[in-house]
Amino acid sequence: MNRGANSDSIPTDLIYEILSRLSVKPITRFRCVSKLWESIICRQDFTELFHNRSSSNPRLLIGVIQGGEWNFFSSPQPQNHYGKSSLVVAADSHMKFSEDKRPRYYSYASGLLYFPNIRISNHNDDVVRVICNPSTRQYAILPPDLRTRYRDSGRLFRNKLGVINLEDDYDGGYLLKLRMFVLEDFEKQKWTTYVHTLRDENKIKDNDNVYVVGATASGQIVLARNKAYKPFYVFYFNPEKSTLQSVEIQGVREEEDWFHRVYYFVDHVEDLRFDVMKTTYAATSIRPAEQNTSTSSREDHLVRTVKRKRA
């Protein structure tokens, strides 16, 4: 059967509408159906439409380091609690990468990840600086003359600076106290302090290392463990309503009983574009990463986390 001939008989407007309702994974596969489908997917109006629809449903991007590899997954972020204290969602698997030798220095912005020390086998095993799009499985290597111009770490923020302090408290049982210090007026150095008590005996145990990993555009504070075990939980705290919602994420390396360091990227927006290649620098390579089987980023707050035990 000639797939290209059959697809060309379908009205272009109908193909456009069908593709626009799909997630990024099948769309990237359908580029191979025919030249017509590829041309539609690469059209600027299509990529912009896809990005706008994805922006209304941001996801939680999860990076798991195990066996010398980054494994990327994503899951839906709860938009509204609707009175539910717990949810179960499925994770989508995206791509694998060799482990960055200095994983603490990664950066995230506009759906792209920057790694300063990635080893790629088909580049003479040299350690290189890489920018990748985990949704489309594309990556680009920074040219040598540009690699020294960027620091190994950095965050973007636009309006308010926030410091979140997470404390343990054993008064009458295990609980977490969340202290938020928000810079309301930069020139006057006016800070506002908010204190919240979090408790979920069924999901958070006294030996769990729970950290603040970010804040969503809707204002929810995201908490998670730095090393995850089955079941895999992420927690969303709404400061306005003082509600804590636990979300069990299924499909994250379920063949393993446990895995190593986990990193989280809040408000990830799937994007078909890889415009950083055109606007920032001339890339030496763009290719899908090998595999075995977007706000674009949170720009409203710069969040630092501190975790300590009370004496």
Swiss-Prot record:
It comes from the Eukaryota. Residues 287-311 are annotated as: Disordered. Pfam families: F-box (PF00646), FBA_3 (PF08268). Gene3D superfamilies: 1.20.1280.50. InterPro entries: F-box-assoc_dom_typ3 (IPR013187), F-box-like_dom_sf (IPR036047), F-box_dom (IPR001810). Residues 4-53 form the F-box domain. This is Putative F-box protein At1g31090. It comes from Arabidopsis thaliana. The lineage of its organism: Eukaryota, Viridiplantae, Streptophyta, Embryophyta, Tracheophyta.
